Amino acid sequence: PVDDVIKEMLETQGWDAHEHAYISEYVKLFLRAMRKFMHTEALIIPNEDLDLVDATYLTYQSMGGALRLTVGCRMTGNVLLAMAGRFSGEEETEVNEMAIDSIEELANVINGLYIVNMSGHSHDMDLDMPKTLENGVPAGEDVFALRVETEFGAFMLYLSREGFMLNEKNLFGW
């Protein structure tokens, strides 16, 4: 069903069949990573935005080379802390440098696995450094979003071929 959901979403935005395959592969890898690193099942819900009432955080990373893809997760502070804690194995109680480092390392691991998989299909790719900013909302012509539901809360997964248009003035930097 993931392939069908992705195909339908991408067709409405004019992406071609080749792009369906590599985006679908990313989403499936992301869901497997949720099981492995977050110890939870994740359900994707297409075309349904998530009203994130409290301050939100966006962690994103761009991949370049043979294929270009930028991915990001937009989440509440509580979801960020839950993900960072599950990944690091330590209890995270506040959004600070340690929590941000954990969530960015999770992005590095997931996206690193993806580019290794893509190299197996003769698509050499590289990773930019992950970034996290407060109150960031990805924008751009080809950005599409999936709502991800987990036992520790919901968040948005954004994907784009061309990158996100963002105001990075709220970028965390330690």
Predicted regions and their residues:
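N-terminal auxiliary interaction/assembly segments of multi-subunit proteins
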Residues: 1-174
